[in-house]
Amino acid sequence: MSSVNLMEWSALKTQLQAGRDAGKARVSIGPADTARITRMTYADNHLIVFMNARLAKENHRLYQFYAEVRCDLYSYKSCYGTHASATCHRNCTSYKTFVMPGLRDVHTDKLHVVKFKRSDEKRDKNCLDGYLADVNRVHMQTSLLEGQYVRFKNAHACRDYRLSHTAKDVHEFESMLERVQVSALSHEILPVVACYDIETHSDGQRFSAPDADFIISIAVVVRRDAADTRICLFYSPDDPVDLSSSSSSPPAAPDTAAVHFRAERDMIAAFFQLLPLLNADVVLDFNGDKFDLPFLTGRANKLCGPAEAARATKIARYDLSPVNVVTQQSYDKFSNKLHSHYLTYYIHIDLYQFLSTDSEHNDLENFQLNTVAEHYLKKSKVDLPIHDMLQMYGEKRLSRIVEYNVQDCVLPVELFLKLEIADYMYTQCMLLYLCTDDLLRNISHKITVAYFHLALTNTVAAADPTPDPYFFNKYDLSVTSGRKRAFNEPAPSANAIDLSQLKRTPVDAARIPPSAVKLCSTRQSCTYKGGKVLSPKPGFNRWVATLDFNALYPTIMMWEGVCMSNVFIASDGNVYLDKNVNAVNPKLLKTLSEMRVRYKGLRDQCEYNSFYYKLYDKIQNALKRIANSIYGYYGIFFKPLANYITKMGRGKLKEVVGKVEAMSDDPRILREFGLSKINFSVIYGDTDSCFIRVLFDEAELAPDRRQTAIRSIVQDHVCKTLNDSWCGYKMSLENIMLSLILLKKKKYCYLNNEQRTKYKGWLIKRDMPLFMRKAFRATVDSLLRGHSTACALGLLAEQMLRYYREFGAPRENLVDYCFSMSYNETSTTAKRRKEEDPARKPVITIAKHCRELLANPGVDFLPGNGDRIQYVLVDVKEKITQKAFPLKLFDPDSPTLQISWLKHMNILCTFMNELIQVFGNRPEFEHYFGAIVDEYTSAQMYDVRYPVLVPTRRAKAGKSAKKNDSDSDSDSDDDDDPATTPVNYHSLFSMHLKKPKRQAVGEFEPCPQCVARA
């Protein structure tokens, strides 16, 4: 908690301006000072380079400055001349087309391209690279890169934060600099980070809207060299206001400067004036693209009118000309609109959008700030319900509102640093020629930008600098993805492709190389086929080793020459892949792989958690994420090539199974470890990994030697034999599982060699209430550690009954009992149904139903597209959708609205059935399941159901049973399920309306593990 100091706006502005004026004095930047380019922006044929430097003579003080230099950029457009003569009057250049150009040394299709200087009147007119930002072009056409560390070769002076130099253009400016390697750094230079957040008023009956509701406060927090500046602007038309804290504890955080405004329009204008005074490099918000920025500009328009609002909300920095906020419209996977906001002189990152669209963060329960902060920072927000905030504001007690507002800015700043977003962003800039504004762009845009430049600068081979350029016409991808159509044509089939639309000259079938691979025909329907999944053998296993391929798909793409420039159409009507490993994509992947190996090696030479260790680790992790994302590009734009990659992966996994199982009873292993027998059995495999059960006579190895021996056997014999048989491909030992519960594909859990339980695809789904997940995991953990099923189920019953009795006390724990569902205005399912039956009523999902309920009474956060809405079921006589009730509005003490445990018990039923499938039918399942259900339904009036054991029927050969369980996965992987799978159970539970008669059960046998401990 921080103390709040009330200040006048003029006093705060003077204080901040004084700090800025102190830095206007002459500062010398010399060869001993390392600088980092934090951002670049381009306008009117001039490049503005924002830099942060560590001043060696001033104890490495952080100094921010900028340089401005003339910079001519160039674009490309098609030349439609006849080219009858040897030269073109437009001075065009002929490039091989990057997408399916033909076959090297036989025939390649050409594209005639004119390179022209960009100007304001010719910016994107008929431009083939119109999707590039100007800073992308700077990265491609100069040696300057955002995120780059540099030094000036000679000393230069800075006055008013502006670098004085004599460079006439950007190329002279480049010659003034030398690049600094990361290994030469003594201090990391991070951008100065700011975050803002607004709190809005409402009538308590609906969500805030800028046309009707005002802004209560705007908080800003700036982190510069680990020190915070905290400011909160608040609006209250009347005096006085109470900013005294109700807490008696001393403040643990820096003071917050609070400024009282009696006019809301003045407060909004002051916020935009703060940006240049605070001079951050990065401006964060949390859901700002959808809420905060539109609300700020909406209120400014409402209060001032469009003309005055445009002036008040301009973005300024240093003495540069103020500019408008730039918006760009994009779409998510559900075709919902999203407006991104760009602040020109600052890097703007909506942290909510970053987290919710990055697959690295899929394990989060939801993307609300409190959830994210608890997951990554082990911190939580200040709790302030909307109705309490409105009451406090009405009573002019603003201290908690200020504290709440400021904390909502502190957490995103800490998340930005914790998740190392700056390093990931700058690594993308340096490797893929992206700009900092591309951070939130989708993967297809990012890879397209990289391919555009790499195609133009391609060479014959990595070791041969002879130019071999291609031109990447992005619009060819509309054909390869099957999306091209005329404006008056209906949308094509999702899987149909017609590559004849590219109008490529077919290669004579007689000239096709023997090594070329047939991918598809020029016209066909192509569906995506995923990686191989070896049919799991369900059950409980001990001593299981997992082997993983190192970067399987990137390795396949490197060694198979996977690249759009290697694909060609032949005269036999088929499409082929020429395995040229010197193509653009294989060389990119090889570069990424070699860089990652180098940085991992440098990291491992450093002391753990030291400055260099963390620096190298951040870079190698960013390289890994970039390389792994490239495969998905082909799944979007050319499925036949993606299918070839997965086909090769399936073949490799199948090869592993044969080689591993052939090593059973290897004489070398038996002799070295003194064993009479050893059997390797692959019990499961998924895409790039396989599970190997190691069977041996445990009596022949001392208990303290077993784990070490298994590790040595698998690592030094199994892995080595596999890797020695390949060229380029490599497998590594990922883990030794002391015990494993394998349920079905992509669903298992295990006890690792550090005695920690890990879950994959099982008991992790976000829709399962947290209290059930905790109870289920405690049960499974006891089973993995050798406890009996009766002992584990007794623990389950004990915990489930305790959670039932604790429901609603305290109120903050309600979130542990709820479900959640993603909200989308337009889902793909609803779209498909609409196409099938236009007269059909729109589908109202649980999420839509709950959002409508939330919008009416007013809440502090109204879920948008992609947000997960938390809800419970209430005990009313309705269908499931109508039973759903938003958690934010649910009161556990309400006499009229009680919770329904219907869905909770259905989830418990699924869990019990999963355990039966592993451990077989036992009387303890029926006993404990019945006891739990009886307690939970004791006060429920409607939809009470009881567990009944129903005999199972074997699935017919070739058909897989469809089951609607809580953890089911939908995927398109190639499944090796056999026609029949042996089972060790004869019946499973089903929930019925009629309560069954239960047989009395005596005491269960004592748990051997518990007896041994006692």
Swiss-Prot record:
Function: Replicates the viral genome, host DNA polymerases cannot substitute for the viral enzyme in this process.
EC number annotated for this UniProt entry: 2.7.7.7
Gene3D superfamilies to which the protein is assigned, alphabetical: DNA polymerase family B, C-terminal domain, Helix hairpin bin, Palm domain of DNA polymerase, Ribonuclease H-like superfamily/Ribonuclease H
Catalytic activity line of the entry: DNA(n) + a 2'-deoxyribonucleoside 5'-triphosphate = DNA(n+1) + diphosphate
Name of the protein in question: DNA polymerase
Gene source species: Lymantria dispar multicapsid nuclear polyhedrosis virus
GO molecular function: DNA binding; DNA-directed DNA polymerase activity; nucleotide binding
Family as reported in the entry's similarity comment: Belongs to the DNA polymerase type-B family.
Gene it is expressed from: POL
Record has Nucleotide-binding as a keyword: no
